[in-house]
UniProtKB/Swiss-Prot annotation:
Keywords: Allosteric enzyme, ATP-binding, Cytoplasm, Kinase, Nucleotide-binding, Pyrimidine biosynthesis, Transferase. The gene is pyrH. The keyword Ribosomal protein does not apply. Catalyzes the reversible phosphorylation of UMP to UDP. This is Uridylate kinase. Belongs to the UMP kinase family. One of its GO terms (biological process) is UDP biosynthetic process. Homohexamer. It comes from Wolinella succinogenes (strain ATCC 29543 / DSM 1740 / CCUG 13145 / JCM 31913 / LMG 7466 / NCTC 11488 / FDC 602W) (Vibrio succinogenes).
């Protein structure tokens, strides 16, 4: 099964990087993520990464009171994702990995501009590629950006690394009777408004038959086990059976 899943894109939320602080970047979490990604690379898995920017600023929230226009707020959010991407690059390099950051917005003093052919070449050479600045356009989430990049680089799946071990029929943090959904179709994820990703991201994955895997990022070894085929540790959104 692993041979069919040799290239993946992992999506981390910006909030996850903040840890218990709720804001900024917790270097201990960066170090943990780096060790998890390193285990993938050591197992010949090509890895792309997208990180949100919510630990620094969220475009939607910044534009709520009307002082900052939504377009500008979203660009601010894109810059936040680049900050996180550079931090992750440092952590991965500290772990001994070869890493490139590619931004959808030109920031030539800091990182490469996104070129999908170059990204694929980096992956083929065993480098981890971190995609920053979302899609480069306002009004699109980093979930949508992650799905887009996964499709462009030919990833076999997109893994949404979260604080829970999959998708539930309701919030497991609030409801003790919440049931984990091991598998669900794209249509179910869209129609039931289950909080997997935003509708644009799910629809894009559906149109391109890209499996969405939701798992707990804080359990050591989870990412590798899931890529190697242990679906009991996650929820998988895919085509209707």
């Amino acid at each position: 099964m692993q041979s069919k899943r040799s290239r993946v894109l992992v999506k981390f939320s910006g909030e996850a990087l903040a840890g218990e602080n709720g804001f900024g970047i917790d270097t201990k979490i960066l170090g943990f993520i780096a060790s998890e990604i390193r285990s993938l690379v050591e197992n010949k898995i090509e890895v792309g990464i997208v990180i949100g920017g919510g630990n620094i600023i969220r475009g939607v929230s910044a534009a709520q009171d009307g002082v900052i226009r939504r377009t500008s707020a979203d660009y601010m959010g894109m810059l936040a994702t680049v900050i996180n991407a550079v931090a992750m690059q440092e952590a991965l390099e500290h772990a001994g990995l070869d890493v490139r950051v590619q931004s959808a917005i030109e920031l030539k003093e800091i990182c490469e501009s996104y070129i999908y052919r170059r990204a694929i070449r980096h992956l083929e050479k065993g480098r981890v590629v971190i995609f920053g600045a979302g899609t480069g356009n306002p009004f699109f989430t980093t979930d949508t950006a992650a799905t887009l990049r996964a499709i462009e680089i030919g990833a076999n799946m997109i893994i949404k690394a979260t604080k829970v071990d999959g998708v539930y029929d309701k919030d497991p943090n609030k409801f003790s009777d919440a049931k984990k959904l091991d598998t669900l179709s794209y249509e179910e994820a869209l129609d039931d408004r289950i909080k997997v990703m935003d509708d644009t991201a799910i629809a894009l994955a559906k149109d391109n038959r890209l499996p969405i895997v939701v798992c707990n990022m804080f359990k050591p070894g989870n990412l590798l086990k899931i890529i190697q085929g242990d679906n009991g540790l996650c929820s998988v959104v895919g085509q209707r059976q």
